């Protein structure tokens, strides 16, 4: 009899947990996530960000600088063997340049620029997502390398789809999987986040991205010369 009661209690607890998980909504998960990373008000104060990083490739350290001016420009710059390459995205245009095989920047296809517009958003897709025109669906619980995560599906106005995995215990972002279509082909990109750090501005930020990119320092709301987002002629 005791065994039967214990079994019933165990099953009840298990079912209660599952019902509780299913009962949660996307907005519930988003609210807890935003609270965990410093709160939406602190993130909305950020208008510019410059990240000085190191990317490891075949045992070699590659300096990387990522600069974002909220809603205006994104620039990814890396230096290998004395050659500096970059990719620039603005609200309407984009360019890429690799001095090893180009004499001048190449304009990015219109579709590529459209799909990359979310890079101009420092806040990310979960803050004011409805106002941004995003649609988010809660897909329940999933496992990411042993970590129980809440799974959210984000559909952006550009047509890009992103699946977001949020740690069910601390509500930090663990992984994103982006899906886009280019030239009729579906492409997927997985990004993993870690080493969350409290910054003076009141936000919590992942200093490790994808296991290969480490952020050494972050400059927030420092003056950014907008000319770095223009194509050099």
Question: What is each model feature region?
Answer:
Residues 27-101:
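N-terminal mature ectodomain segment of secretory-pathway/periplasmic proteins
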Residues 147-232:
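Gly/Pro-enriched, hydrophobic low-complexity segments
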Residues 68-70, 88-89, 138, 166, ...:
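Generic beta-strand structural signal
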Residues 22-35, 42, 93-160, 181-186, ...:
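Flexible, processing/modification-adjacent segments and terminal tails
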Residues 6-14:
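Sec-dependent N-terminal signal peptides
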